[in-house]
Amino acid sequence: MINTIKQDAKNRMEKTLSVYLSDVDGIRTGRARASVLDGIVVETYGGRVKLNTISSISVSDNKTLLVKVWEINNVGAIKTAIINSNLGFGFSCEGAVIRLTVPDMTQDMRKNLVKLLGKISEDCRISIRNIRRDIMDKLKIMQDNKDISEDDLRIAGVEIQKITDEIIKKINDTFLAKEKELLHV
């Protein structure tokens, strides 16, 4: 029973970490990365589809992304979606290929992105600690109901804290690496 609760805690924390990592990966750093376009949704085929489902996205060089559109009649809709995304990319079209140029980032932009990164990181840490608190509350209720002993509660608490510390270390390491990438000119 305790192992199930510990596994639940680990799963919930890892899902939170996964969402955090995808959020951090979406932050622009001044270098061309295909993942920056992951959130772009295109109005086509009478609905909304993700850009990467109707085209292939690749990195040409440090400042250029290539979007190879699979059906040329989608080029206009993709251009509109990129413009509406407010990513600030310059672009040119050559048939079914859209070339996106990543603009240089100003120091102010970099500082604002570091602040955003810090906020996202802190929100994730808070979520992880809330998961730990919820799990510990469940364990305390179990101990109050005499389902587990006080020793079991203490041992489980230490193990839950160990899992929490590992996840928060990953968050901190990711934050520091991304901060270094953002501030590197």
From Swiss-Prot:
<dbReference type="InterPro" id="IPR002661">
    <property type="entry name" value="Ribosome_recyc_fac"/>
</dbReference>
<dbReference type="Pfam" id="PF01765">
    <property type="entry name" value="RRF"/>
</dbReference>
<keyword id="KW-0648">Protein biosynthesis</keyword>
<protein>
    <recommendedName>
        <fullName>Ribosome-recycling factor</fullName>
    </recommendedName>
</protein>
<dbReference type="InterPro" id="IPR036191">
    <property type="entry name" value="RRF_sf"/>
</dbReference>
<dbReference type="GO" id="GO:0043023">
    <property type="term" value="F:ribosomal large subunit binding"/>
</dbReference>
<dbReference type="GO" id="GO:0006415">
    <property type="term" value="P:translational termination"/>
</dbReference>
<comment type="similarity">
    <text>Belongs to the RRF family.</text>
</comment>
<keyword id="KW-0963">Cytoplasm</keyword>
<dbReference type="GO" id="GO:0005737">
    <property type="term" value="C:cytoplasm"/>
</dbReference>
<dbReference type="InterPro" id="IPR023584">
    <property type="entry name" value="Ribosome_recyc_fac_dom"/>
</dbReference>
<comment type="function">
    <text>Responsible for the release of ribosomes from messenger RNA at the termination of protein biosynthesis. May increase the efficiency of translation by recycling ribosomes from one round of translation to another.</text>
</comment>
